[in-house]
Amino acid sequence: MKKNIIVTCLTVAFILCLCITVSVSARYRLDEKSYTQTATDTIIYQPSVNYKFSKATPNVIVDTDSSLYCFLEKLSHLRSLSNDSIKNVSVVHIGDSHIQADFFTGTARKLMNHYFGNPGRGLIAPNRLMKSNNGRHYKITSSKQWKHSFILKPNGIPIGITGLGLQTKDLTADINILTVDESFPGEWDFNKVTAYCDIDKTDVYLIQPNVINIDTITPFAMTFLLDTLTNNVDISFISPEKEISISGFHLSNGKRGVFYHSIGINGAKFCNYNQCSKDFYRQIASLNPDLVIISLGTNEAMVRAINADQLYSDISDFAYNIRHSSPNTNVIFTTPVETFARAGRKTSAIPNHKVGKVRDIIVNFAEKNGYPYWDLYNIAGGKGATLEWNKKKLFVRDRIHLTQRGYEYQGELLFEAIIKSYNQYIKANI
């Protein structure tokens, strides 16, 4: 009898653990029908872990002028299927190394796709080919050697939509793109590929699978429509001028949903993006962004003294460049989480309070110019919060970058803040 009771208890415990595991693993899984079932209702969401920080402020997007109205309206139409003309909503998140790693943006992407539909992986960058860290859920490989240029070190190689550019002097070059998600096979399959390259100087071919349509509506990109969904494609580039330049790719599957594109460059500042040519901003405009999220400021705080006037000017120039090329987009500024200070080439155990000064300048610009902002600096606990984040093991050893869990938590917080704004819109307008 006692043995049977033990077996029964173990069985129940196993079932409970299995249910919890399935629930957690399915948290970001897209059910193509689920996101339309409560189309005009608010969305209930909260981060998977509720970290407590002593001086944290409410997790909201400050939008006193209701600037996000158009973006939120499109989200509501997308979710309700009430407007057939709105098939996709496009978000472009621009930043530094915190964005390049894609744990932050990757989490926000998964959540947006879960609740509003998954139209594909969107923009991807060939970072590995320049020996830098890659984004999530894709691999780009090539048998050729590529020289590179990026916004911190431009050298004449054209810099494109991803903030970098690759170039080879060979007559031909090959690229393989593979999308991967071990948790959810097929999640990022695609049947449409856009290659960002100089199509005036380069012929582009897809070796497999079969192509049913080719589109060259822009001078800087070529789009291929495939006859089937796939997670693997080989692309061949041929140039009679022995100069092949590429900057990135765009993957989609033809379904409704939110594209969540990320553009991140390690070490980037506002001023680096301002040095980009007009082509960079034109190519961003080709993504038809409904919302641009700007997450910079960490590297601006890694200096001996902050020039407040210059930083304000850099922020203003960047905002102008985005709005000038994409006049119909909404823009959100975010503030950086406090990090630890540098001591020479090493990181000290002292919080870098200059991050707070950068935060103040970003917020000052946003408030004066009517831009919404997400004040992650204070949402994360404000001045001194670095010590709490470090105790919770949310920083890696350099105490400037976060652990994967730390970035995922930021992504959950950002999505929660967007959903709060979305729910306010729904209550006021539906």
Located regions from the model:
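Catalytic His-Asp segment of secreted/periplasmic serine-dependent ester chemistry enzymes
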Residues: R27-Y28, S277, T339-I430
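Short beta-strand/turn micro-motifs composed of small residues
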Residues: G95, C197-I199, T335
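Membrane/wall-proximal cationic-aromatic binding patches
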Residues: I43-H93, N155-L164
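Conserved, compact domain cores that house catalytic/ligand-binding motifs in diverse enzymes
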Residues: K87-H93, Q100, F104, K255-T347, ...
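Bacterial Sec-dependent N-terminal signal peptides
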Residues: M1-T38, T42, S421, K427-I430
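Conserved SGNH/GDSL esterase-like catalytic core that processes O-acyl groups on lipids
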Residues: Q100-K201, Y205-Q208, D215-S313, H401
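A generic secondary-structure signal
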Residues: K74-H77, R282-Q283, N321, A417
